[in-house]
Structures are given as structure tokens and as C-alpha cells.
Amino acid sequence: MLSPKRTRFRKQHRGRMKGISYRGNAICFGKYALQALEPAWITSRQIEAGRRAMTRNARRGGKIWVRIFPDKPVTVRPAETRMGSGKGSPEYWVAVVKPGRILYEMGGVTENIARRAISIAASKMPIRAQFIISG
């Protein structure tokens, strides 16, 4: 699963996801891509599940690029803990995704194989996403 090797700070504020993605919203590497249509936090487990599904479906052909990286730590308090006594410990990592962001790219395969593989990866995501073709 993806996570940063080291960060400057162990914990982060939650922040808010407003607006659309101005960076990472164009196809750069492959010919086909999966584009987010809603804002969400996508966990490293979800990213990995989508990547595995695409790889398995494409068999040996083609190349896959993951265009998002989970660099935000999410902290969780232990169950049945009283209020106060600080913020919880980091539990898992998420990628902050805004509408328009490219999640995965694919190249070196035919369109129907790419469409099938990317639609399976889209079903693993917690958001609505669309299949797009470069050019």
C-alpha cells in the first residue's frame, strides 16, 4: 500500500475540499484515463484495490499509471476514549481528490480492454468517475 516514506509533521488538519482540480486534470502518460467527478478522500487501500483490478483485467498487455498519492494522514481515537487528551494517532493515509482529477491512466491496450479494466477500477472507488480518452 502507498504511504510517504517520511513527512515533516505526523498529524494534519482535516481541511476542506472545495472547487475543482486545476492540477493533475489532463492525461499525461497513457491514452485512456479515469477522471473523478466528485470530491473525496481516497484511501491507500482503495487506490491499491483499483490498481490490482486494472492489472488483473488487462492481463500482461499495457501499462498503468497511478496519478494520485496518499500523502494526508488520518488520525483515529481509540474506542471508548474520553474527550480531551489530544489528537488520536495516525491510522491510515488518504489522497485528497477534487472533481476533474485523473486517478489512473492506461496505455498500450485496445479501447475495449481499457474501458473494461477502468470501469472495474471505478467500481472500487468511493466516488463517481468517468472514462476519458486523450486527444
Curated annotation (Swiss-Prot):
The protein's location, in the record's own words, is:
Plastid, Chloroplast
Q: Which keywords are on file for this protein?
A: Chloroplast, Plastid, Ribonucleoprotein, Ribosomal protein
Pfam families according to UniProt: Ribosomal_L16 (PF00252)
Annotated TM spans: none
Is Ribosomal protein set as a keyword in this record?
yes
Q: Which GO terms describe its cellular component?
A: chloroplast; ribonucleoprotein complex; ribosome
Write down the CDD domains for this protein, in alphabetical order.
Answer: Ribosomal_L16_L10e
Q: Which GO terms describe its biological process?
A: translation
Main location per UniProt? plastid
**GO molecular function terms listed in the Swiss-Prot or TrEMBL record:** rRNA binding; structural constituent of ribosome
The reply to whether Plastid figures as a keyword in the UniProt entry is: yes
Q: Which family does it belong to?
A: Belongs to the universal ribosomal protein uL16 family.
What is the annotated quaternary arrangement, including any partners? Part of the 50S ribosomal subunit.
What is the name of this protein?
A: Large ribosomal subunit protein uL16c
> Species name for this entry?
Lactuca sativa
